[in-house]
Amino acid sequence: MNASANLCAASDNDPQPGDQEAAHPVACAGDEPAAFLPHDLPIFLVGMMGAGKTTIGRGLARALRREFIDLDHELEARCGVRVPVIFEIEGEAGFRRREAAALQECTQRRQIILATGGGAVLAAENRQALRERGIVIYLRASVEELFRRTSRDRNRPLLATADPRATLRELMVAREPLYNEVADLVIDTGSMPIATLVKSLLPKLQAYEKK
């Protein structure tokens, strides 16, 4: 059996730690009363690695009492291995195929907050699904801020280069037009506290009408 087959075989019965948290509504005792939206459209977060999609997504899910899904965690649960291992065994092309399949399924769910991977917008079919099926929020941050947030993270295969800052800059140049293409809302994350950022997002989501 080859490496790819081993990767597939693990997908059904070897979930990773943290998958349960990513697959259920995020709510804690003592939380403020839930905010409500006038629709059940899913909310999709896009942006570069380190933009805060997972952290902000959890905050939104808590505020709205919605299910939170991290697309990378979803892939890890299906494959039974971490994202860097998928890259190592199947390369970026193999990872993107798996990512696209998971995204197509997840974007059909209602009342979710979905944090996508930084490169999920590269495929045209992914961009179409994001645009047509929910509200897309582009979480924007500068290259310097992204570098500061990701510099100690060893689970970023695309940043395993001699100059991660330059790599981030190149990725930003290639991807930012695609983020803007799909975005219904653009939010600069900067150094704003997560709770403050989430609170500022809620009225925008309540007022937004998908065209």
UniProtKB/Swiss-Prot annotation:
Q: Which GO terms describe its biological process?
A: amino acid biosynthetic process; aromatic amino acid family biosynthetic process; chorismate biosynthetic process
Q: Which GO terms describe its molecular function?
A: ATP binding; magnesium ion binding; shikimate kinase activity
Cofactor(s) annotated in UniProt:
Mg(2+)
EC number(s) given by UniProt: 2.7.1.71
Under SUPFAM superfamilies, the record lists:
P-loop containing nucleoside triphosphate hydrolases
List the InterPro entries hit by this protein, alphabetically.
Answer: P-loop_NTPase (IPR027417), Shikimate/glucono_kinase (IPR031322), Shikimate_kinase/TSH1 (IPR000623), Shikimate_kinase_CS (IPR023000)
Q: Where does substrate bind?
A: 72, 96, 118, 175
Q: Recite the UniProt keywords alphabetically.
A: Amino-acid biosynthesis, Aromatic amino acid biosynthesis, ATP-binding, Cytoplasm, Kinase, Magnesium, Metal-binding, Nucleotide-binding, Transferase
Concerning HAMAP family, the annotation shows:
Shikimate_kinase
Put simply, this protein is called Shikimate kinase
